[in-house]
């Protein structure tokens, strides 16, 4: 008798009595009503098909992609580059005429850097620009040196390191000139600039941030 009185109501009995179902039935009814409100344009059959296959995303969801860290390729060290002789100029390429186009490019580069070299251009301005400029391709001459054999050597600058200049002469000879204890001149369009090698012992990439004194010592 007790089991008959307290048995669960069927869906029809609940609807007839206007009684809300409890437990699992109530949860299912709530979910279906919620989905119907959330997807008003979707037909019941389409909604049912979606539920059978996968979860329905009710809000806009952005999946954050993990950024994979790119491994930087490790380059060769300075020692390895020297051992591989990557900076050596091959004998068949040690020809003055081969680098004349480089000199013409350098002259145009300096003209652009100085906004045009005119007769009324201030020499101090040109000097300041040249001290920070890339000199590869410039024609340089040794005017003073503690080693007399260096004096008078003139050629196109091919390579520059912290302590030396490598130049190619008109006789197609590659010369290595130390900066220390040497004074060099650079000429372009009638303007002559002096470089005191002892104060110039920097890599070309470091000179752009270097502050040179307006009046340096002329001692070798």
UniProtKB/Swiss-Prot annotation:
Q: Name one GO molecular function term.
A: ribonuclease P activity
Q: Which GO terms describe its biological process?
A: rRNA processing; tRNA 5'-leader removal
Report which superkingdom the organism of origin falls in.
Eukaryota
Phosphoserine: which positions carry it? 10
Its annotated compartments are:
Nucleus, Nucleolus
The record's InterPro entries line, in alphabetical order, gives: RNase_P/MRP_Rpp29-subunit (IPR016848), RNase_P/MRP_Rpp29_sf (IPR036980), Rof/RNase_P-like (IPR023534), Rpp29/RNP1 (IPR002730)
Keywords attached to this entry: Nucleus, Phosphoprotein, tRNA processing
Kindly list any coiled-coil regions of this protein. none
UniProt entry tagged with the keyword Nucleus:
yes
What SMART domains does the database record attribute to this sequence? POP4
Q: Name one GO cellular component term.
A: nucleolus
Its quaternary organisation is: Component of nuclear RNase P and RNase MRP ribonucleoproteins. RNase P consists of a catalytic RNA moiety and 10 different protein chains; POP1, POP4, POP5, POP7, RPP14, RPP21, RPP25, RPP30, RPP38 and RPP40. Within the RNase P complex, POP1, POP7 and RPP25 form the 'finger' subcomplex, POP5, RPP14, RPP40 and homodimeric RPP30 form the 'palm' subcomplex, and RPP21, POP4 and RPP38 form the 'wrist' subcomplex. All subunits of the RNase P complex interact with the catalytic RNA. Several subunits of RNase P are also part of the RNase MRP complex.
The function of this protein is: Component of ribonuclease P, a ribonucleoprotein complex that generates mature tRNA molecules by cleaving their 5'-ends.
Q: What family, per the record? A: Belongs to the eukaryotic/archaeal RNase P protein component 1 family.
**What is the designated name of this protein?**
Ribonuclease P protein subunit p29
């Amino acid at each position: 008798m007790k089991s008959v009185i307290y048995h669960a109501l069927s869906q029809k009995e609940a609807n007839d009595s206007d009684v809300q179902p409890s437990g699992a039935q109530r949860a299912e009814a709530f979910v279906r009503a919620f989905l119907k409100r959330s997807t008003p344009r979707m037909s019941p059959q389409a909604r049912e098909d979606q539920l059978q296959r996968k979860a329905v995303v009710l809000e806009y969801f952005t999946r954050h992609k993990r950024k994979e860290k790119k491994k930087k390729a490790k380059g060769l060290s300075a020692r390895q580059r020297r051992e591989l002789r990557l900076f050596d100029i091959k004998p068949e390429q040690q020809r003055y005429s081969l680098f004349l186009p480089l000199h013409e490019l350098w002259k145009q580069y300096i003209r652009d850097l100085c906004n045009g070299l005119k007769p009324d251009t201030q020499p101090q301005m040109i000097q300041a620009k040249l001290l920070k400029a890339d000199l590869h391709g410039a024609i340089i001459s040794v005017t003073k040196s503690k080693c007399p054999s260096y004096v008078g050597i003139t050629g196109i600058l091919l390579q520059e390191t912290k302590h030396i200049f490598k130049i190619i002469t008109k006789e197609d000879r590659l010369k290595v000139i130390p900066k220390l204890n040497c004074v060099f001149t650079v000429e372009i369009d009638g303007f002559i600039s002096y470089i005191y090698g002892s104060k110039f012992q920097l890599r070309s990439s470091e000179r752009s941030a270097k502050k040179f004194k307006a009046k340096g010592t002329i001692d070798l």
